[in-house]
A protein has these predicted regions:
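Short, charged, surface-exposed hinge/linker loops at domain edges
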Residues: 215-224
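Charged catalytic carboxylate motif
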Residues: 31, 35, 89, 96, ...
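Crotonase-fold acyl-CoA enzyme core
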Residues: 6, 95-209, 238, 242-243, ...
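Terminal peptide-recognition signature
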Residues: 17, 21, 36, 53, ...
C-alpha cells in the first residue's frame, strides 16, 4: 500500500511516517489527513513496536491547509464545509495516536504551526531540530485551537503559559520549548532523524506491553483521582507481572545479561 501524501517505511519494527507535501509546508489537507490515519493504522497492523513521525522539507507541519479551506468555503458557501467532516477526521487521527499502545516519537523539523503543533504534542515524546519553531497560530487568523491543543499544551507547560501562547499566537523557539517543558529536547537539525530513530530503537527493544500500559496510565492520570489511578496502576502491574517479558526481565537481572523482550 502506498500513500499520496505520506511516506511510510517499516524497518526493525520501527514505522517511520513522513508527511510529504513539502511545497505546501506539509499543510494538513483532507488527503493528508486520510493518509496519516491509514499509515498509523498500517503501523499497528504491521506489528510495529514504535512510530517516528516527521515531515519532509523545511516544515514539520504548517497547520491546516488554508488554500483548501478557502476553496471549499467558496464552493459550498459556508465555512462549515471545511470545519465539520475534515476537522472530525483530524480529530480521529489524534485519537488513533493517543489510544494505540505504540510509542509515538515526533521528529519536528523547521516550521511547526497550528494543528501541526498539536499533532506533535499528541506524540508521547517530542524531539525537535534546534532551528525548529512552534506557533499556536490559530488566533492570528481569527480561529481557536483544535486537534487537542487545549488538552495537551496546558498539561505540559501549565495553564498560564499555554493561555499566553494561544492568545498571542507567538512563536516559540526549540530551545525555549525545551525550557518550558513543551518538548523533550532539541538537537542539531542534521541529526534529528537519527536521534528519533535511536530512541525508537531503544523503545522497540523494550517490553512494549509494559510501555503500552505506561501510555494508558499516563493518558488516564489527568482525569483520574488518586484512588482511581492507584487502581489502574494495580491493574496494569498485574497484567505486566503475568507477561513473558517480566519473567525474562527478572531472569536477565539475575543472570547479569541484557534482557530479550518480545512484547509478550
Amino acid at each position: 500500500m502506498s500513500f499520496e501524501t505520506v511516506e511510510y517505511s517499516l524497518n526493525n519494527a520501527i514505522a517511520t511516517v513522513t508527511m510529504n507535501r513539502p511545497d505546501a509546508l506539509n499543510a494538513l489537507s483532507l488527503q493528508l489527513t486520510k493518509d496519516l490515519d491509514a499509515a498509523f493504522r498500517r503501523a499497528i497492523a504491521d506489528g510495529a513496536r514504535a512510530v517516528v513521525f516527521t515531515g519532509n522539507g523545511r516544515a514539520f507541519c504548517s497547520g491546516g491547509d488554508l488554500r483548501e479551506m478557502q476553496s471549499m468555503w467558496e464552493k459550498e458557501g459556508r465555512i462549515e464545509a471545511f470545519l465539520e467532516d475534515p476537522l472530525g477526521a483530524l480529530h480521529g487521527v489524534i485519537r488513533v495516536m493517543r489510544e494505540t499502545p505504540l510509542p509515538f516519537i515526533a521528529a519536528v523539523n523547521g516550521v511547526c504551526a497550528g494543528a501541526g503543533v498539536n499533532f506533535a504534542l499528541a506524540c508521547d515524546i517530542v524531539i525537535a531540530a534546534d532551528d525548529a519553531s512552534f506557533r499556536e497560530a490559530f488566533v492570528r487568523i481569527g480561529l481557536t485551537p483544535d486537534c487537542g491543543g487545549t488538552f495537551f499544551l496546558p498539561r505540559v507547560v501549565g495553564e498560564k503559559i499555554a493561555t499566553e501562547l494561544f492568545m498571542t499566537g507567538d512563536a516559540v523557539s526549540a530551545q525555549r520549548a525545551v525550557e518550558i517543558g513543551m518538548i523533550n529536547k532539541a538537537v542539531p537539525a542534521a541529526s534529528l532523524l537519527d536521534e528519533a530513530t535511536q530512541l525508537a530503537t531503544k523503545l522497540a527493544a523494550g517490553p512494549t506491553g509494559s510501555i503500552g500500559r505506561i501510555k494508558r496510565m499516563m493518558n488516564a492520570s489527568f482525569s483520574n483521582d488518586l484512588t482511581e489511578q492507584l487502581a489502574l496502576e494495580h491493574e496494569c502491574q498485574i497484567e505486566s507481572g503475568k507477561s513473558t517479558d517480566f519473567k525474562e526481565g527478572v531472569a536477565a537481572f539475575f543472570e547479569k545479561r541484557p534482557p530479550n523482550f518480545t512484547g509478550s
